[in-house]
């Protein structure tokens, strides 16, 4: 079978170099009608949900951040004025918000348009079993929901599709560095503990299912640029009911040793979107990542125009700057040695970071 080190080398071996001629060929395969539909749906989503993401943050307490990193950034970036500080805080939190929950929602909107060769009833969907799990939590207190979620069977699975007697389950990760050690352990434990149950439930829900593929998907990046955490999941599965299916013909693909009907592998960047576009023959769908990017560009231009975001953003930053100004310490109330040792900018940075230790602060 080889050692884990050799396994990592195999997973990292594939190189993805930018070749303009290849991109031109991929452009020729894009479906203009599907792209337009994706763009329209995305524009609707953005015009409705992006303003909500902006409006969600009101006071300083909605901009919580690390006070130590904050003071360092403020010094390096020379953020001397409340207005500059407000823009920095807003921009950083806005980006983080888009990269997490809002970004994940947009990814879901894209995924549901595929696979390309499927019928109307064969698109990527939320697993019905996961939907049922969530429905069972309705009406429970938050504490009860938290307890129930610890025993969730489908928590790690985001999307599902059935094609040609095989069910594909995918756990979608936003980027090549977003999986941490805790998530590695959670995903590994979920697969080890639930893969037989996932197969059983799949065959109960879809009578035609004979095989199951469990795929860790990363929406951008390459095999060589990831932080290796997705590969650690695969390595940890070796010896826990899974073996390599065929190192030469199917590098990086694991299969359950007992029934040899359940596979686990990961797909990154272009290969992830090719898998989403055609799980059965992903090599024929290498253009899907371009289709997604073009739809995003078109959808953003439409959606942002309809949402009138510029005024909202400016109002939020002005409100945040005013709140930061109120946090300034009165110079006359400070000890003389403090007034001598620290500049007005340094005291502003200090006062802003200090609010992180209070309910009303950042």
Residue ranges of model-derived segments:
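Interdomain/boundary linker segments immediately adjacent to catalytic/signaling cores
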Residues: 2-110
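Short amphipathic alpha-helical segments that mediate assembly, nucleic-acid/protein binding
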Residues: 4-7, 19-23, 230, 286, ...
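Polar/charged alpha-helical tracts
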Residues: 9, 21, 25-28, 48, ...
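Short, flexible coil/linker elements and helix-boundary hinge sites characteristic
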Residues: 15-17, 114, 139, 207, ...
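General structural signal for secondary-structure boundaries
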Residues: 80-84, 180, 268
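Catalytic centers of nucleases
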Residues: 101-202
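Catalytic cores of nucleic-acid endonucleases
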Residues: 174-263, 267
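Non-catalytic C-terminal interaction segments of nucleic acid-processing enzymes
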Residues: 248-362
């Amino acid at each position: 079978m080889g050692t884990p080190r050799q396994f990592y080398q195999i997973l990292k071996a594939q190189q993805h170099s930018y070749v303009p001629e290849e991109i031109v060929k991929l452009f020729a395969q894009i479906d203009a009608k599907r792209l337009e539909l994706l763009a329209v749906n995305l524009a609707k989503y953005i015009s409705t949900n992006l303003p909500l993401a902006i409006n969600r943050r009101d006071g300083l307490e909605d901009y919580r951040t690390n006070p130590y990193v904050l003071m360092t950034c403020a010094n390096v970036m020379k953020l001397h004025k409340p207005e500059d500080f407000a823009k920095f805080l807003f921009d950083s939190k806005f980006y983080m918000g888009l990269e997490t929950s809002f970004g994940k929602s947009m990814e879901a909107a894209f995924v549901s348009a595929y696979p390309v060769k499927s019928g109307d009833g064969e698109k990527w969907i939320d697993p019905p079993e996961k939907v049922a799990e969530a429905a069972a939590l309705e009406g429970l207190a938050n504490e009860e929901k938290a307890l129930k979620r610890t025993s969730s069977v489908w928590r790690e699975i985001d999307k599902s599709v059935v094609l040609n007697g095989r069910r594909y389950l995918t756990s979608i990760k936003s980027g090549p560095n977003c999986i941490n050690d805790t998530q590695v352990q959670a995903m590994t434990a979920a697969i080890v503990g639930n893969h037989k149950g996932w197969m059983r439930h799949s065959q109960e829900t879809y009578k035609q299912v004979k095989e199951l593929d469990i795929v860790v998907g990363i929406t951008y990046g390459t095999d060589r640029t990831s932080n290796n955490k997705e590969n650690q999941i695969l390595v940890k599965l070796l010896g826990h009911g899974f073996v390599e299916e065929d190192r030469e013909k199917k590098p990086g693909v694991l299969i359950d040793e007992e029934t040899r009907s359940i596979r686990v592998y990961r797909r990154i960047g272009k290969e992830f979107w090719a898998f989403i576009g055609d799980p059965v023959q992903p090599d024929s769908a290498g253009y899907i990542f371009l289709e997604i990017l073009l739809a995003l560009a078109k959808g953003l231009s439409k959606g942002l125009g309809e949402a009138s975001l510029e005024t909202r953003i400016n109002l939020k930053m002005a409100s945040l700057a005013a709140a930061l100004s109120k946090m300034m310490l009165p110079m006359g109330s400070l000890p003389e040695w403090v007034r001598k040792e620290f500049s007005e900018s340094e005291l502003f940075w200090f006062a802003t970071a200090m609010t992180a230790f209070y309910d009303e602060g950042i």
